[in-house]
Curated annotation (Swiss-Prot):
Belongs to the class-I aminoacyl-tRNA synthetase family. IleS type 1 subfamily. A motif ('HIGH' region) lies at residues 58-68. This is Isoleucine--tRNA ligase. Binds 1 zinc ion per subunit. The gene is ileS. The lineage of its organism: Bacteria, Pseudomonadati, Pseudomonadota, Gammaproteobacteria, Alteromonadales. NCBIfam families: ileS. GO terms for molecular function: aminoacyl-tRNA deacylase activity; ATP binding; isoleucine-tRNA ligase activity; tRNA binding; zinc ion binding. Monomer. Zn(2+) binds at residues 903, 906, 923, 926. It comes from Shewanella baltica (strain OS155 / ATCC BAA-1091). The keyword Nucleotide-binding applies. A motif ('KMSKS' region) lies at residues 605-609.
Amino acid sequence: MSDYKFTLNLPETEFPMRGNLANREPEMLERWTKDGLYQQIRDSRIGRTPFILHDGPPYANGSIHIGHSVNKILKDIIVKSKTMSGFDAPYVPGWDCHGLPIELKVEQKVGKPGQKISAAEFREECRKYAAEQVNGQREDFIRLGVLGDWQNPYLTMDFSTEANIVRSLSKVIESGHLHKGVKPVHWCTDCGSALAEAEVEYEDKTSPAIDVAFVAADSKAVAAKFGVSDYSHPVSMVIWTTTPWTLPANRALSLSPELDYSLVEFEKDGVTQALILAEVLVESCLTRYNVESHTVLGSAKGAAFELVRFNHPFLDFDVPAILGDHVTTDAGTGIVHTAPGHGQDDFVVGQKYGLEVANPVGDNGVYKPDTEYFAGQHVFKANDNVVALLREKSALLNHVAYRHSYPHCWRHKTPIIFRATPQWFISMDNHGLRTQALKEIEQTQWIPDWGQSRIEKMVENRPDWCISRQRTWGVPITLFVNRETEELHPDSVSLMERVASRIEQQGIQAWWDLDAAELLGDEAEQYRKVTDTLDVWFDSGSTFSSVVAARPEFHGHGVDLYLEGSDQHRGWFMSSLMISTAMNGKAPYKQVLTHGFTVDGKGRKMSKSIGNVIAPQTVTNKLGADILRLWVAATDYSGEMTVSDEILNRSADAYRRIRNTARFLLANLNGFEPAKDLVAVEDMVALDRWVVRRAAALQQEIIEAYEQYNFHIVTQKLMQFCSVELGSFYLDIIKDRQYTAKQEGHARRSCQSALYLISEAMVRWIAPILSFTADEVWQLLPGERDAYVFTQEWYQGLKSVTLATDLSDDYWQQLLTVRNEVNKVIEQARRDKRIGGSLEAEVTLFADAALTEQLTHIGDELRFVLLTSEAKVLPLADATSEAVETELASLKLLVASSTAEKCERCWHHREEVGTIEAHPTLCTRCVTNIEGDGEVRLFA
């Protein structure tokens, strides 16, 4: 055999079977960086149609988690596939760099601004900290194989971006959308300042829980809504609250529109009255009020009482009943005391009804001098006095001490209050922002499509946007306000441009360093500088203008796609929509794609306490980034994305299937030079032409799936092709021809040409997803080529050629089905020890007339398709009793062990082995392939 071994065309490649991705990928990254790969891609697309995916900036704090990885990998797949489709698709990653979490981290290191460190020094420390965080996250993102302008990302703290954020605000102001108002915030009376959510801790506290009656301004009319006519006793709505001190600020009573309310009459202490209570809470309430017997006079929905007036229990005005979604029946009466100046829900519903945002409480937690009854009292100490006054006014139905969870200041560990403070707002309705935003939502493509109704509901119901914050590390609201009238300076827009020019040179500190007289001259004494900073959502929400419109690589082209997690309907998608519509009257994006959150194998959120966190760094260090990328691509991102070690191991198994296919292709292109060896598709063996045709059709399906962002369909089709059409059929069949045919003969070159065309196409199909592996394959493909697959376009060499004499795709599909049936019978014969390998088998196919015509069409080459040494086709009626039935009614099979000698070179059992004097151990075909012109194959 050794003499003939060297006449075989054995596969050979440097492409290793094991990916060893964890070690090899970093080496590839080094080469990508050294070669300036991203710039090579940019250069290859100069002048092409732009496609702009704008990166929603992650927050520059902490390490990246699996959700970050999903997001960046999805973006990278899209950018690479769009580039492959010929677009100029730059990717500029960004980071959100201002805001409270960074302030808190820096506070822990250097103390609060204004105490141990000046505000200017504090901002500089925040800038340094954010830069460190960006550097750490950047390395992790690069490790994932994400290509982008990593050396020149956008940061919201870049001086130029900070300046452009100010310019965006000036355009919003110029369009008339800014107004000043008040909004309740967490307020620490010990700090004398507002607290952000992150500065609030919840501890148990004992508070007075009271039930208070608000008597109807017109009891008879209210009773009539319950179907009770000419009612002569007082009718009251009852609220339950644990903050009696907020009652001076009460401006409404909130009911749930669809909840059933009862009118309940009873007599107590000689007085007959009727109370309005939620139907499901009547019994528990009356038990609290020590009412022994009562009569239900009627029932009505909450919606019936909208804008009906009720008297304040101790102040000389009445308040409306209003409707709110925040009303529940978990506790209390089903009617909520509403003080817009002292609660977020109260404020939101108050905005809807145009209620006064009353704030009788000063910075120090003491009632202001004009507060009737309680002026000069601290709110918590006033609780008892409020209760006493209610008792005196006969409005108190119940009073108990109540233990509950209550917000406390994280620094002082003392209870805090909600308190309305002056803030800056973008109005939703003063200049039609809400209406226009809803129109723009309709013009945008939302993927998945339920995203549209979700953001529509949010826009329909959202209050004005409070854009001001009382923070140190943020872009300043660069306004001058008249000290007497509180009006903006009439030249605010031009003044903001002058400030922006300074910020462009010196950063946001330029605002705090600015002496008003430098810009206002003699007017400086009449105006004060606003010291508030912008909500960080304004920073990121304006990047379509501050970054995309400003950077040259975007060519002034608008954004095509925003892509973030599904929580961003409320976040970045919303803030971007509001700012763009306020500035330009249109949405900042054409498409918005959202992906679900990552959960573990049991559907639980990632949690350190549960111990189910999958860190992307761990995955890349153990399995490699391509495995993580394949998991992301193969998962339907429209819902929750399930990940676990087991799931990632399954991805690794799928990866091996693709890698093994690539290795087979490369190994069998050994010695193939496309420039001289490529066989035209129309001249190929029929089976080769069929597989090229299948690949061409598949390429169209894959491109379409990429276009529709259906990456899980890309991976499904790729796996199907590798496993079934190639792995189980084509590659299996051609091994004999590839290894044993004449090296330079048509039969082999036809096969190699098909493998080459498939390889050229497949390396491009996988490049957006399996980027490292695609690069590895690309470097080993034969023929002259550019340095990187990522600068290429979809392969144009796949031709869907069908000759008149060709067998149809249905024909080959039928042969695949027949072959599967033959394999089952051969496998059983092997288990029964009747044969060894399939080449020891001779198979007789008993087929009906139609199937016989198909099977005999390819003559003796049928045996090559079936991988047997002999294949005979006989009429189905001739089937012997030993013939095995198959799943095809038209086919029965009989397998026997060949009695012919085995060819030493090709291992086929042939009658002529031993009859050729010069080569007694070979078959005629092998002799032809060694010494003659090579065998002729027409079909397989």
